[in-house]
Amino acid sequence: MHLQQLVVSWFSLVWLASPIVAIWELEKNVYVVELDWYPNAPGEMVVLTCNTPEEDGITWTSDQSSEVLGTGKTLTIHVKEFGDAGQYTCRKGGAVLSQSLLLLHKKEDGIWSTDILKDQKEPKNKSFLKCEAKNYSGRFTCWWLTAISTDLKFSVKSSRGSTDPRGVTCGTATLSEDLGEYKKYRVECQEGSACPAAEESLPIEVVLEAVHKLKYENYTSSFFIRDIIKPDPPKNLQLNPLKNSRHVEISWEYPDTWSTPHSYFSLMFGVQVQGKNKREKKDKLFTDQISAKVTCHKDANIRVQARDRYYSSSWSEWASVSCN
């Protein structure tokens, strides 16, 4: 998120008296105040201006206080903590004239706060936002974890190399799984002009904006589609016993979601026999074909997974079939 400085002589809801104040518009009627967060920090002075041509009879209130905070067309607020944030309303004669919601974005020791999401610590520390693609179509899924269950709002924006914010469209974030201590949210994104066979020169940028009560945070991830590829598992696993042999031929098909043509977008497959005791596993066999010969014991399973043949993508989840 690029820091913006709202410097305007008249704004329908908020007018900032100082051009150096760290405040910017998140959406209509909602503003983020950026604060250095340490004991005795000076805070920020914010001047609100009521959207009315009149000068007299105006009162100001906040959802944080039952008292009248001031009178007149403008209200100066010293924002130092969350008790100073919230929704401010100007009225005249009981009628609401305008409202502004102030959120806080904390910076401690030069680092923006990351309190809302869980650090998944894979593949490295500070991995809050994770993304995967099933193919090279430009469609990908991102997800994140949070221990917070109420008063949450997420918004996701994406672009290719931050040059065209309209180039990648992301849907609405949804709760996809309740993991007990944590909630898993996900969002689907699609690059509008993706060319599966083209070499990527600029990474995709993803920005997740998170609001919990009066706290604002943002999280970013940057990647090439080729680096987040994880195919779906192979499908239609079949066993064909071989005569006079303990071996069987196992065959499978490419997942429906994988890019075509398969002659160009080829997969590598890993095949493994798993004994009745799931800890008992044979060495994995690798092949770029859609069949393999393996030894199949009673009560064992044969499982197959896939990854991009030419680029070291993540392996798919396993697909399995019983030897019985």
From Swiss-Prot:
Single GO biological process annotation from the record: negative regulation of smooth muscle cell proliferation
GO cellular component terms, semicolon-separated: cell surface; cytoplasm; interleukin-12 complex; interleukin-23 complex; membrane
SS bonds (residue pairs): 50-90
Compartment(s) of residence: Secreted
Signal peptide: 1-22
UniProt domain Fibronectin type-III: residue ranges: 233-324
Domain Ig-like C2-type as annotated: residue spans: 23-106
Main location, first listed in the record: secreted
Sites carrying sugar chains: 125, 135, 218
Pfam families found in the cross-reference section: IL12p40_C (PF10420)
One Gene Ontology molecular-function label: interleukin-12 receptor binding
Keyword line: Cytokine, Disulfide bond, Glycoprotein, Immunoglobulin domain, Secreted, Signal
Summary of the function given for this chain in its UniProt record: Cytokine that can act as a growth factor for activated T and NK cells, enhance the lytic activity of NK/lymphokine-activated killer cells, and stimulate the production of IFN-gamma by resting PBMC.
Protein family according to the UniProt entry: Belongs to the IL-12B family.
Binding partners and assembly: Heterodimer with IL12A; disulfide-linked. The heterodimer is known as interleukin IL-12. Heterodimer with IL23A; disulfide-linked. The heterodimer is known as interleukin IL-23. Also secreted as a monomer. Interacts with NBR1; this interaction promotes IL-12 secretion.
Name of protein: Interleukin-12 subunit beta
Originating species: Sus scrofa
Gene symbol of the encoding locus: IL12B
